[in-house]
């Protein structure tokens, strides 16, 4: 019988020696739903890309131009709310349930303030952003509308991400995956009606008129926004109604505490800076790619979506590692934190190695899901096969960084990611793009990911990431 995370935490606090088989089972029990959740999230991205891609390469390029900016803005917010889930994991590991509920309440206030502020900022710059990024004049109107709608939904996007992260910190990885599954299904339905115009379809041999808004690119953003809003409200509802260590119906204060602010600064600031550094580098990469033509822009955007099929497993295991290492550190069990870190990292490397093989074999078919443009498919398949060789080391960096974040060592992750992304990838892409085009940009990415994975494995082996100690 698999231990629950709550039972494991109790045994760790008592100083018991938990068998490796038990730790492996609980790591799998938390990882599998998280991997499935990442699969659903990636499927939602595939749906958007495929439905828009079949409109034409211009529509795909319109989204691709602003995609790196969505990563930048969302990434900063993810860094901040991940800091809240790390605090909760460590407090639950130390059996400080009242403190964990206090952090949850404070996170809800931060979510409201930051979400509304980010939405206002994104909508405000949406009119000018495509031009800043060098988009062709023919793409700017649809790119601007897409980014404005996406930005307006940020409070709900943050709510879904933050509250599902809280649930995972308690050891409940199943509920977030079910919420994500529903969100994906709703996204399909909304996109079906919002992207396409009113049209005739064959249903059981009969021609049926189906209403459609015909919004094209903005319709994809609106469908995702509506489905994510429902997901965020559902996650909040679970936290409001369910009994358990994070039940906020139990008495407690909504006051923002100095301890929470200190921990948010210590963990959240480097995480947000890391996300900003990675995403702003992606913005510069898109700026480099935007000068290579519409086919290269579309192939790059769809290639990134296709590659998501590979690294979703890594991010699913990363979610589990944050919860596991966070609770082990909270229970003051360095030995268990190390065990979980290496166990999860090896799982990530192994699964992403298999994913890389699949990516190399099925690259043309994956690109064909998103577009019928032969030139885009050919170029996209070529760069995906380059990227396939980096997947195992990319998995190492993803999961090892999650382990370090769970221990509160977000500064170390920031430094390694900053060096590899800005010192290696951008430099190589700048040098190779004029000579090799999009192939050069993705070759730079492959080299950088291998270097990044090696750096994270070295830091994991040295063990200094555990020196931060438990949060106050």
Locations of regions flagged by a protein language model:
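Small-residue-enriched core segments of transmembrane alpha-helices in multipass membrane transport
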Residues: 180-187, 305-308, 418-427
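Alpha-helical transmembrane segments of multipass membrane proteins
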Residues: 46-50, 128, 162-166, 188-193, ...
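Small-residue-rich hydrophobic transmembrane alpha-helices
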Residues: 60-120, 157-176, 286, 299-357, ...
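Helix-terminus/linker motif at the lipid-water interface of multi-pass membrane proteins
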Residues: 39-61, 130-137, 193-197, 207-215, ...
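N-terminal transmembrane alpha-helices
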Residues: 18-50, 54-55, 68-87, 112-119, ...
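Short alpha-helical transmembrane segments in multi-pass integral membrane proteins
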Residues: 1-34, 88-155, 186, 197-269, ...
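Transmembrane helical elements of multi-pass membrane transporters/channels
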Residues: 29-48, 149, 160, 227-231, ...
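Hydrophobic alpha-helical membrane segments of integral membrane proteins
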Residues: 175-179, 222, 415-416, 443-444
